[in-house]
Amino acid sequence: MPVVQNACSFVRLLASGRDRAKFLHNFCTNNIKALETGSACEAFFTDVKARILAHGYVLAFEDAHEIWISPGDPAALLKHLNRYIITEDVAIVADNPSSATLCFHADENVLTALRAEQVAIGGDELSDGAIAAAVDQTLSIRFGIGEAEQNTAVTGLLVTWAKQPVLFLTGPAGPLAALGSRLDAAGVSALSNDEIESLRIDERYPLMGRDMASENMAPEAERNVQAISYTKGCYLGQEPIARLDAMGHVNRALRVVEISGPCEVASASGCPLKTTDGTTAGTLTSVILRPDGISHGLAMVKVNSIHQPLHVTDDSGNERMVHVRSA
């Protein structure tokens, strides 16, 4: 059972110290101080101008917080956060670079199989109600696999993507791959890279360096409900985000697009979206071919062009009509 090795993998930063929640709260867009042990939330880390430095999830545990971000430049975020630590009791370090990720459609079959594997680390995190709870909230779990005296710690993130509960597991690559093989033998198969990518696109979950970059402001991802708290108080980047909220819209936004027919996946990402008069209306950032032969993807689109007829021409010369899905 292969572990996930594409851009849907997460890299982790680990935060410890009694001031960690308050510190992270002050440097990301969501309400970290409100997180209870065993919960998690999506968040952006931004600079003072609300430009995105990183995006992902913050997971709360009794003794630490974990920051899960898409592969990109975790060292830059680590350097950014550490430069603001002065007298606070907080330490932030990078996780082991050999860590890897498994991803599953989260259902009770998965939890049953994992309970058979686990050596519990504090509490019964893999409870029968965990899947039902994930429909309304994002959860974090931590457990061990292997023999009790030398178990390997695994961290899990339970989220809802495109209205489907999804479980990500991360840990050392070797033991995690072995766990995946045992689960597969038990009839529980991890999602393939293409399945994860299709879910990610339908969820409109951006990858830094592909769908979003450091010149983008956090609200342009249009994940305000999931990742931005407008009531948490001050944090780095809060003022520009509040101004955009007061304006009522951004000038460009990340949207799901459906493409009328197969599109050369390898060459389509980065292609411009054009209006009927040839004006550039946006850029295709991610694309995947569905089993039904229709391509869908993500695109950064000018808001005033979202309802216009658009088309894209890939590097092979294929011109396809593009429909921008409502947010």
State what each model feature region is.
Residues 1-55, 59-62:
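Acidic, proline/glycine-enriched N-terminal capping motif
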Residues 3-5, 11-12, 57-207:
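Acidic, low-complexity central loop/insert segments
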Residues 17, 67, 104-106, 169, ...:
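Residue-level signal for inorganic ion chemistry
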Residues 27-33, 81-86, 183-188, 245, ...:
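Short, solvent-exposed amphipathic alpha-helical segments in soluble enzyme
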